[in-house]
């Protein structure tokens, strides 16, 4: 009988915790946003040395979809010249910290 391969599901909260840890390791701030009445607003506001401010949406690596509301916020903020990031994994965190 063949063995079944189980893939560990990575939760959004796991990615979010890693993002916070890595941002704070650079001396930055990674604030959780609770925007009451603002459906689809970003999960985190990141402030990095420089200063650089980035609005960030965190999604789980597999199956985490950006909603229409979230996409709308991202498009609007980017049109205003505000950096926006969608983070799904460690590679995305690396890219955010290097940009």
Predicted regions, residues:
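Catalytic phosphate/metal-binding cores of nucleic-acid and nucleotide-processing enzymes, i.e., regions
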Residues: 1-99
């Amino acid at each position: 009988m063949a063995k079944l391969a189980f893939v560990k599901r990575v939760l959004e909260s796991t990615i979010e915790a890693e993002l916070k840890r890595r941002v704070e390791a650079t001396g930055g701030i990674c604030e959780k946003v609770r925007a009451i009445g603002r459906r689809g607003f970003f999960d985190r506001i990141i402030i990095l040395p420089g200063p650089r401010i980035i609005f960030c949406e965190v999604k789980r690596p597999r199956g985490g979809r950006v909603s229409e509301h979230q996409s709308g916020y991202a498009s609007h903020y980017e049109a205003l010249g505000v950096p926006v990031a969608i983070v799904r994994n460690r590679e995305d965190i690396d890219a955010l910290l290097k940009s």
